[in-house]
Amino acid sequence: SKSIADNPNVAVLMDQDAGLLPSGFNPNHDTGDTGNDYPYGQCTWWAYTRRAQLGLPAGSHFGDARSWGDSARALGYWVDNMARHVGDIVVFAPGQQGADGYYGHVAIVEEVNADGSIKISESNVKGLGVISDRTFTAQEASQMTYIHY
């Protein structure tokens, strides 16, 4: 890998993203990962769990779903409004696409399709701890926030 990332999974993604990374991006930023401290079955618990399965970083104390983008950005994660990879964390603003009106929602990108649509996996939409999926059009997907690495 050409990347300077310590995490080999991040290094592979960075190589794919050459030329797109924010200026001065440091892939070895503090991840904030001290284990899964989110309540079992919540959307935040699943987002952390799935990222761990994929070998990607996620903070243990990003707060309520609505605050994940800001919390991640503050630690140095690359956060923007474009789904790029399987494993990206999708942050839904409160009320967006059926997200809770106060807490918001987070999920994980499972597919990024050629037409810009995405398929996500998520927890606590169909019941506590129930993992389900949804697909969003490119237009819908472009309205959300994504935490990459």
Please annotate each region the language model reported.
Residues E110-Y149:
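Aromatic- and glycine-rich peptidoglycan recognition patches
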Residues N7-V106, E111, E122:
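Secreted/periplasmic proteins that engage bacterial cell-wall peptidoglycan
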Residues S1-S3:
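N-terminal prepro-regions of secreted/extracellular proteins
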